[in-house]
Amino acid sequence: MCGITGFSNFKKSIENEFNNIVEMNDCLIHRGPDSCGYYKHKHVIFGHRRLSIVDPFGGSQPMTKKINGFNYTIVYNGEIYNTHIVKKNLLDEGYTFVTYSDTEVVLLSYIHYREDCVKHLNGIFAFSIFDEERKCIFIARDHLGVKPIFYSIKDDYLIFGSEIKSMLKHPLVSSVVSREGILDLLSLGPSRSLGNGIFKDIKEIPPAHYLCVFEHKVVLKKYWKLEAKEHKWGLEETKEELTYLLEISIPLN
């Protein structure tokens, strides 16, 4: 478990707002007690708290790769089960790796596939990438929403974080509970309706969605849907198929 947070504004410089990310990141120390890191750009500031599991020295974040003169920077929380498959495909495309971490695999996957990178990832994840070439922030959440990620768009700012309390440390994010939030607390609490962040200024990126924020537009898109199909097999066929699926899926995890 790691923690990610950050904010951006493509219409003005935010370099003098670094203290905000420090306060936001400090709220996530329980998610990543091993180390912390920051990335600062004229329009983008990222923070990361790390729990080191794979490649403790090579997987430090935020991680930046420079391709064709443009920087791509990621903060990532998760685990990719098919890392070796995605990595091999990228190696075949001519990419090189300098670490053993899945963070680098996710970042290069985005650089090659762009938004479609999520269709190649099998795992649990929430990550944000600053794409300097396209001048955008790309945030994605895993298919079933195991890893949390919240965001707010206000006054030309994008603000995001693994937890609500880190976002509340940003001066633009209000702690006022929304009408929908009150309804959720009274009817569903401690659960929430899909996409609701309880607070007025905060939303949740739903499972199997990505958010792409440009200077003049915002795109929230669903990239995967679980399809319900009529079950027509008998008992023995069902047992064989279930056994097969377990045998191929468990080693990946």
Located regions from the model:
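Cysteine-centered catalytic environments shared across enzyme families
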Residues: 1-253
